[in-house]
């Protein structure tokens, strides 16, 4: 379907792992590899959740565990960077994977859509001296475009062929999101993660 390159990305858990960039016309994985371990992926906690399901959506509920979950992320990164800065000869594979975030060799890809979550992720970047960060999803990133530009944070938006998250939002918001961010000076890309990805790329 004309797709030349792809980022192969892990899923599941708070820190799914590392991704790599590959070309899709290749004989094997060694031939396909363009850049190995280009980034670490982090699923940022949601400050709220919506009850019910798609046919019968419920109300919006606050996540009472949001602050403890963010604290747990910070503690993990503290431990990882302390390990990387030590002379410990015993290898810890999960902590080893964090190498390169502060030097800029790897990008931290943060899955976040809410305004609060995105702000907290940017503050997390500054606190931990992480050089490169990309917000993945970024539905409400346009509300904090100035902050993203100031901190050199790029955004990978979700599918533009989507309905708004809330009933009273502009029905065209998913289409306009990229333009709003570009106007704010933010580097923007489109990604296609989710259900039925192969059909969506046709």
Q: Where is each model-derived feature located?
A:
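Generic beta-strand/beta-sheet core signal
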Residues: 8, 111-113, 136-138, 156-160, ...
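Extracytoplasmic/secreted envelope proteins and their assembly/folding machinery
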Residues: 70, 74, 95, 118, ...
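A contiguous, well-structured "functional interface" segment within a domain
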Residues: 119-122, 126-160
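A general structural motif
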Residues: 90-91, 110-114, 136-139, 166-174
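His/Asp/Glu-enriched, well-ordered alpha-helical/loop segment
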Residues: 1, 107, 146-149, 154-202
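Short, mixed-charge, low-aromatic patches
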Residues: 76-79, 98-103, 134-138, 158-164, ...
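Flexible loop/turn segments at secondary-structure boundaries
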Residues: 13-16, 47-51, 116-118, 141-145, ...
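Polyanionic/metal-chelating signatures
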Residues: 2-132
